[in-house]
């Protein structure tokens, strides 16, 4: 017999439940460039303060164990897709795209019914939209891209040990979850200016890599590097909406600014748009001038 050991303090309606989540937990993981982020990413930023843990400093990353979480009283879930090698990567750096649905801890029969519906072929997004009490229901249960340390421990443990497209279950203080990992990626990488300089000596690299400079035109008049296309951060609204017509998400993309801060913002945003291999140039053009080429002016 399945026994409920926790309760959900939220009210029974989804709207009130969402408000209770917000009051219960606090965490600020707001994407700096939310202006043109996809809807599920804009929502994820908001929901991070509701569902994904208390204070990020209080959550210790946990290395997943080999087997999925099991709630006693339910049969094992079957796979909806073939296994991949997703969980064999570095959990510390890995980011996953998570979809889930949530019901209250005492809705055991509904949870079993939803599990059966899923196994019978119904889509997780449809089930989440109709039955989930999580605010993500309006996005089909999509939570967005998350990494270790951003979620409550029970949910994190289940999500980060799940294979791609495998559906697993877990229980948190908010209720019972069916969750699925839809995709995975490595975070934005840093590249030192010395390594960048070495790469730039290779004509093949200069031909194939995407080099973008997010500084303002007046800055670029003072100092610039060859091969970099200009995408000023202050003009984000003009070039961001159709960025994939200007840059290829499949290619290596290197982002430059003065000291590395603005470039990291844009690099993270590019990754959120599906760019697979994004590098932030550490220290920016100022570091390039100091460490590689003193002929580049500093300002």
From Swiss-Prot:
Q: Which keywords has UniProt assigned to this entry?
A: Acetylation, Chloroplast, Plastid, Transit peptide
What InterPro entries has UniProt attached to this entry? PPIase_dom_sf (IPR046357), PPIase_PpiC (IPR000297), PpiC/parvulin_rotamase (IPR052204), Rhodanese-like_dom (IPR001763), Rhodanese-like_dom_sf (IPR036873)
Q: Which GO terms describe its molecular function?
A: peptidyl-prolyl cis-trans isomerase activity
Which Pfam families does the UniProt record give?
Rhodanese, Rotamase_3
* Domain of life, per lineage: Eukaryota
Give the GO cellular component terms, alphabetically. Answer: chloroplast
Q: Which CDD domains match?
A: RHOD_2
Which residues belong to any copy of the Rhodanese domain?
A: 205-297
- Domain spans labelled PpiC: 93-183
Which subcellular locations apply to this protein? Plastid, Chloroplast
The chain residues annotated with the modification N-acetylserine are 82
**Secretion signal, residue range per the UniProt entry:** none
Extent of the transit peptide: 1-81
Q: What is its main location?
A: plastid
* Active site per the UniProt annotation: 257
PROSITE patterns under this entry?
PPIC_PPIASE_2, RHODANESE_3
User: Which protein is depicted?
Assistant: Rhodanese-like/PpiC domain-containing protein 12, chloroplastic
Q: Which organism is it from?
A: Arabidopsis thaliana (Mouse-ear cress)
């Amino acid at each position: 017999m399945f026994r409920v050991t926790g309760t959900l303090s939220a009210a029974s309606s989804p709207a009130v439940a969402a408000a209770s989540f917000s009051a219960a937990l606090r965490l600020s993981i707001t994407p700096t460039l939310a202006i043109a982020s996809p809807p599920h990413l804009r929502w994820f930023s908001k929901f991070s303060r509701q569902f994904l843990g208390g204070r990020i400093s209080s959550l210790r990353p946990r290395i997943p164990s080999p087997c999925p979480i099991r709630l006693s009283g339910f049969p094992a879930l079957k796979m909806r897709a073939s296994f991949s090698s997703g969980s064999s990567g570095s959990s510390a750096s890995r980011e996953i795209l998570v979809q889930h649905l949530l019901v209250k801890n005492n809705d055991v029969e509904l949870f079993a019914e939803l599990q059966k519906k899923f196994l019978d072929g119904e889509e997780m997004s449809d089930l989440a939209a109709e039955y989930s009490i999580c605010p993500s229901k309006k996005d089909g249960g999509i939570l967005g891209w998350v990494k270790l340390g951003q979620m409550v421990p029970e949910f994190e443990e289940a999500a980060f040990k799940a294979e791609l497209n495998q559906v697993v279950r877990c229980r948190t203080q908010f209720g019972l979850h069916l969750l699925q990992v839809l995709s995975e990626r490595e975070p934005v990488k840093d590249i030192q200016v010395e390594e960048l300089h070495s790469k730039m000596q290779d004509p093949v690299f200069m031909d194939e890599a995407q080099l973008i400079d997010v500084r303002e035109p007046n800055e670029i008049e003072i100092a610039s590097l060859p091969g970099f296309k200009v995408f000023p951060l202050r003009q984000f609204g003009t070039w961001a909406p159709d960025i994939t017509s200007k840059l290829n998400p499949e290619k290596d993309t290197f982002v430059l600014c003065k000291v590395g801060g603005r470039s990291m913002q844009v690099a993270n945003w590019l990754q959120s748009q599906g760019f697979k291999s994004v590098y932030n140039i550490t220290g920016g053009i100022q570091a390039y001038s100091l460490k590689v080429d003193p002929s580049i002016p500093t300002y």
